[in-house]
Every structure is written in structure tokens, then in C-alpha cells.
């Protein structure tokens, strides 16, 4: 359980939501826009491992990253869970964007059906509508009004 006094107000409902979830599920935090700064802050507040899938797995492969199968997301999450903490799988949508809606839906359904060693937390912006019905109870949707405003430097940093 995380101490609530030292976290930003927008994270309070996220922490409460996470604490109410099963300890071995796939779940999603839906952001209204791409906010890597907030994903990083969230992972820290949740005391979860932050894995930037695009940066750590796709970028080193260059154009060959398009040959990855969706199971690369699953394998990466499982490998990171060995450390005994929940995993925030940031930029999973970069990988999922390579597949048609049916492929994304299939991966989300597979993730929802798995018994994970820890929670798999998926920050989403684009593909929340592809989540399966069995995951709906494991989703929190944040609105722009819930979040701190994004400064120009944060916007520029998000482009990197």
C-alpha cells in the first residue's frame, strides 16, 4: 500500500483503483492524450516497474520491430515481473498499432484472461476501445480535467 499524503491529487483515485484490483490481473489506465510524464509519475507512485516497450524493445530493432509478434508484449511483461513488482507497460500501443483491430482485441483478451504474477498496468490513449468486456472492471479513465496541465517543455519532451 502506498502512502497517500505525498502523491499528487490526480494520483489519489488511481492508487485507490489499483488497491481494489486483484493482485494478478491486467488492467488499463486510459489517458486523454499522450502524457509520458504522467505515466512515469504514476509508475513511481504505484511503486511499479516502468517499462517503455517502444524505447527498450522496438527502437533497438529499427525497421525490424515491425516483425515482432504481439506475444513480445506478454514476454516482456512476464520477464519484468520476475522482480516482484507490478509492471507499467508504457508505449505498448506503439506495438499494438502494427496490428489490425482484431489483432489488438485478441492480445487484450489474452492479457485479460491470464493469471499474471503481478498486475500488468497498461497506459492507453488510442486503443482503449479495443479492450474486451472482461477487462472493463479493471479500467480507470482519466479526463483532462483530472490531470495537471501540460507545459510546452513537457509537450516537446513527449516528441522525443
Residue ranges and their predicted role:
Residues 50-59, 120-124:
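A generic structural motif
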Residues 10-13, 73, 104-107:
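Amphipathic coiled-coil/heptad-repeat helices and related helical stalk/stem segments
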Residues 86-90, 121:
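Structural motif
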Residues 20-21, 78-84, 111-117:
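Conserved catalytic network of the ASCE P-loop NTPase/AAA+ motor domain
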Residues 34-38, 56-60, 92-100, 127-130:
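Short acidic, S/G/P-rich loop/turn micro-motifs used as interaction or catalytic elements
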Residues 1-50:
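Glycine-rich P-loop/Walker A and Walker A-like loops and their local beta1-loop-alpha1 context
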Residues 55-79:
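Short glycine-rich substrate-engagement loop in P-loop NTPases that contacts/grips substrate
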Amino acid at each position: 500500500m502506498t502512502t497517500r499524503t505525498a502523491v499528487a491529487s490526480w494520483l489519489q483515485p488511481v492508487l485507490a483503483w489499483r488497491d481494489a484490483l486483484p493482485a494478478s490481473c491486467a488492467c488499463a489506465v486510459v489517458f486523454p492524450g499522450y502524457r509520458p510524464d504522467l505515466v512515469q509519475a504514476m509508475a513511481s507512485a504505484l511503486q511499479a516497474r516502468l517499462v517503455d516497450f517502444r524505447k527498450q524493445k522496438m527502437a533497438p530493432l529499427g525497421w525490424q520491430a515491425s516483425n515482432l509478434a504481439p506475444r513480445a508484449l506478454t514476454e516482456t511483461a512476464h520477464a519484468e515481473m520476475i522482480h516482484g513488482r507490478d509492471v507499467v507497460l508504457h508505449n505498448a500501443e506503439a506495438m499494438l498499432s502494427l496490428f489490425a483491430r482484431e489483432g489488438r482485441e485478441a492480445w487484450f483478451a489474452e492479457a485479460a484472461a491470464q493469471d499474471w504474477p503481478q498486475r500488468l498496468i497498461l497506459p492507453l490513449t488510442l486503443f482503449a476501445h479495443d479492450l474486451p468486456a472482461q477487462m472493463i472492471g479493471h479500467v480507470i479513465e482519466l479526463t483532462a480535467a483530472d490531470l495537471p496541465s501540460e507545459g510546452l517543455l513537457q509537450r516537446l519532451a513527449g516528441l522525443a
